[in-house]
């Protein structure tokens, strides 16, 4: 099912895949990582001037990873602002997605958290480093295939 934004992107020949709507009627689009920079700029020009949230998740154990962006079109006279959910799927072996820090500054800490927990590399992010875990931490704690270090091994490390 194609929504209004998907039709607009198709009209402008921007590659995407409509995934339907969520329970609130928000359109969900899948974007390939290599298409994300140009589509992000197009969405900003379209009016999506606010990145409400960015998160990531592990799709399946040993499978792919996903980065999710929730964008909102904030206007003075809008009591029901238009929203869209963008999903970008990457392989676990090479989890690279272009950063949108240069478009939405609010993605700074959010992309860093996704990097810290899942190991997704946001290319061209100005400060991509761990934000929650110590710099010396090994692995990506929220991946489904993550093996938790033995508590006593960690205790001995301090």
From Swiss-Prot:
PANTHER family: NADH DEHYDROGENASE [UBIQUINONE] IRON-SULFUR PROTEIN 3, MITOCHONDRIAL, NADH DEHYDROGENASE UBIQUINONE IRON-SULFUR PROTEIN 3. Belongs to the complex I 30 kDa subunit family. GO terms for biological process: photosynthesis, light reaction. Keywords: Chloroplast, Membrane, NAD, NADP, Plastid, Plastoquinone, Quinone, Thylakoid, Translocase, Transport. Pfam families: Complex1_30kDa. It is a peripheral membrane protein. It is an enzyme of class 7 (translocase). It is found in: Plastid, Chloroplast thylakoid membrane. Its main location: plastid. Its EC number is 7.1.1.-. The keyword Nucleotide-binding does not apply. NDH shuttles electrons from NAD(P)H:plastoquinone, via FMN and iron-sulfur (Fe-S) centers, to quinones in the photosynthetic chain and possibly in a chloroplast respiratory chain. The immediate electron acceptor for the enzyme in this species is believed to be plastoquinone. Couples the redox reaction to proton translocation, and thus conserves the redox energy in a proton gradient. GO terms for cellular component: chloroplast thylakoid membrane. One of its GO terms (molecular function) is quinone binding. The keyword 4Fe-4S does not apply. It comes from Angiopteris evecta. InterPro entries: NADH_DH_suC, NADH_quin_OxRdtase_su_C/D-like, NADH_UbQ_OxRdtase_30kDa_su, NADH_UbQ_OxRdtase_CS. This is NAD(P)H-quinone oxidoreductase subunit J, chloroplastic. It catalyses: a plastoquinone + NADH + (n+1) H(+)(in) = a plastoquinol + NAD(+) + n H(+)(out); a plastoquinone + NADPH + (n+1) H(+)(in) = a plastoquinol + NADP(+) + n H(+)(out). NDH is composed of at least 16 different subunits, 5 of which are encoded in the nucleus.
């Amino acid at each position: 099912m194609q929504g209004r934004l998907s039709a607009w992107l198709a009209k402008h020949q921007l590659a995407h895949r409509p995934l339907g709507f969520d329970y609130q009627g928000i359109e969900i689009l899948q974007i390939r990582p290599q298409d994300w920079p140009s589509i992000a700029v197009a969405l900003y020009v379209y009016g999506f001037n606010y990145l409400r949230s960015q998160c990531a998740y592990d799709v399946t154990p040993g499978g792919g990873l996903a980065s999710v962006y929730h964008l909102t079109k904030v206007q003075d006279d809008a009591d029901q602002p238009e929203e869209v959910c963008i999903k970008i799927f990457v392989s676990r072996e090479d989890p690279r997605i272009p950063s949108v820090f240069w478009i939405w500054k609010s993605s700074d800490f959010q992309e860093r958290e996704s990097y810290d927990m899942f190991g997704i590399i946001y290319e061209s992010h100005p400060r991509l480093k761990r934000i929650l875990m110590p710099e010396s931490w090994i692995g990506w704690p929220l991946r489904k295939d993550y093996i938790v270090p033995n508590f006593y091994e960690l205790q001995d490390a301090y």
